[in-house]
Each structure stands twice: as structure tokens, then as C-alpha cells.
UniProtKB/Swiss-Prot annotation:
Salivary gland. Member of a multiprotein complex. It comes from Blarina brevicauda (Northern short-tailed shrew). This is Soricidin. Paralytic toxin that immobilizes a mealworm for 7 days. Inhibits the transient receptor potential cation channel subfamily V member 6 (TRPV6). Belongs to the opioid neuropeptide precursor family. It is found in: Secreted.
């Protein structure tokens, strides 16, 4: 759910750097996420998987 993801991101990120409404619109695909809050939130909410040695 975009609103829950963006709310979590606003807690994890510095709130001054995040506009929750913009984040939600980007998450829903209604706004491009080029260099905006959506890109920032993706780093917190969906970090890259690290390949662990086996």
C-alpha cells in the first residue's frame, strides 16, 4: 500500500527531505519519480538485495 510505504519512509528518511503526498503519487504511478521523493523512498523501502557468500 503506497500510503503505508510512504508513511514508513517519512519516519526512516529525514522528514524535511520528503513530501509524503508526492511520494504517494509517485508510488501510484501518477507522477514521475525522477530525482524526487519516490526515488529516495525506494532506497529505504526496497533496498537492493546483497548477494551473500554461500
Amino acid at each position: 500500500d503506497c500510503s503505508q510505504d510512504c508513511a514508513a519512509c517519512s519516519i526512516l528518511a529525514r522528514p524535511a527531505e520528503l513530501n509524503t503526498e508526492t511520494c504517494i503519487l509517485e508510488c501510484e504511478g501518477k507522477l514521475s519519480s525522477n530525482d524526487t521523493e519516490g526515488g529516495l523512498c525506494k532506497e529505504f523501502l526496497h533496498p537492493s538485495k546483497v548477494d551473500l557468500p554461500r
